[in-house]
């Protein structure tokens, strides 16, 4: 009789980890069960996962004891943090430490840690070519995750470090929405230069993570970078033209201008895109072919736009 292995999924009610939860639940013969970890087991998203067969467990990333209980008996754990919940890179790093320690104590066989570059390796705090943001970070929503890598390494927990790229769902929430220019033509203004921007859907991240859990011999101890496509600003604009039903042009703008635009987080977004644009290997570390080998149904940007057209706001 085969033994079913439990994968505990942090953030299972969210988009990215939810993709992993759904991948597990959609494969009842795969030999894995989903333990959905959430702060609110009574939420609609948690109840939906429960209805699909997940075991829903309450835990908080700031509460180490709750994580130990949530990970107990699990074969694998998917670990992540969300800067945009706390707006604190330091707290993200502390949450990474809590998850790594809990995984060690629980004796899990395989952890996937959803990480990012700590950009301070490329831009030290005294490097004024990229402004240092409050708290001592360059790109805080990445730096805190990258700093968290060391906790997983120190525990000795068999870990895969998953590098994900830009989430195209950001367009659904209005990030980078093309604005009419002085001549009336909608313009996608980004400090990306001519660099390609790796991107992916949240659902595809989850499917890739599930495949990684299924092949630990290949992926434990490795940093795995995935992407669904690498698109230039012009290619992003062309895809969005189909959504808007009118031309959208790409306008590269300097990061120093973008970071002073009047919207919250402009300085963070400018630093983030500057890191991509200045050829620090962000693009080359995220591999479409590898992602497709993990997930044959992987969507490219054009496919995602076609499938998501009705969800991308056209009134801006």
Region locations from a protein language model:
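Rossmann-fold cofactor-recognition segment
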Residues: 50-63
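Short, functionally important structural connectors and interaction interfaces within domains
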Residues: 53, 189-192, 223, 286, ...
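A hydrophobic C-terminal alpha-helical subdomain
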Residues: 219, 255-316
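A general structural signal for well-ordered alpha-helical segments in protein cores
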Residues: 96, 145, 174, 269-276
């Amino acid at each position: 009789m085969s033994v079913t292995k439990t994968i505990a999924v942090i953030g299972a009610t969210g988009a990215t980890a939810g993709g992993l939860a759904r991948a597990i639940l959609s494969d009842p013969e795969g030999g894995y069960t989903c333990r959905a970890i959430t702060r609110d087991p009574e939420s609609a998203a948690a109840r939906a996962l429960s209805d699909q067969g997940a075991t829903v467990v309450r835990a908080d990333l700031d509460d180490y004891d709750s994580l130990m209980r949530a990970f107990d008996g699990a074969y694998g754990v998917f670990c992540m943090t969300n800067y945009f919940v706390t707006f604190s890179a330091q707290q993200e790093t502390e949450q990474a430490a809590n998850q790594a320690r809990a995984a060690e104590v629980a004796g899990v066989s395989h952890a996937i840690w959803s990480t990012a570059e700590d950009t301070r390796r490329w831009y030290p705090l005294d490097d004024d070519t990229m402004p240092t943001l409050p708290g001592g970070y360059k790109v805080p929503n990445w730096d805190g995750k990258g700093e968290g890598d060391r906790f997983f390494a120190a525990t000795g927990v068999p870990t895969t470090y998953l590098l994900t790229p830009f989430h195209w769902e950001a367009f659904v929430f209005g990030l980078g929405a093309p604005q009419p220019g002085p001549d009336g033509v909608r313009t996608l203004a980004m400090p990306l230069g001519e660099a390609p921007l790796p991107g992916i859907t949240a659902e595809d991240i989850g499917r890739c993570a599930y495949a990684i859990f299924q092949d630990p011999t290949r992926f434990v101890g490795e940093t795995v970078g995935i992407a669904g496509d690498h698109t230039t600003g012009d290619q992003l604009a062309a895809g969005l033209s189909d959504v808007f039903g009118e031309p959208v042009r790409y306008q590269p703008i300097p990061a120093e201008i973008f970071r002073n635009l009047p919207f919250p987080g402009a300085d963070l977004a400018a630093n983030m895109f500057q890191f991509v644009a200045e050829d620090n290997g962000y693009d080359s570390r995220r591999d479409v072919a590898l992602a497709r080998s993990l997930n044959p149904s992987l969507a490219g940007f054009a496919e995602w736009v076609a499938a998501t057209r009705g969800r991308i706001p056209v009134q801006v």
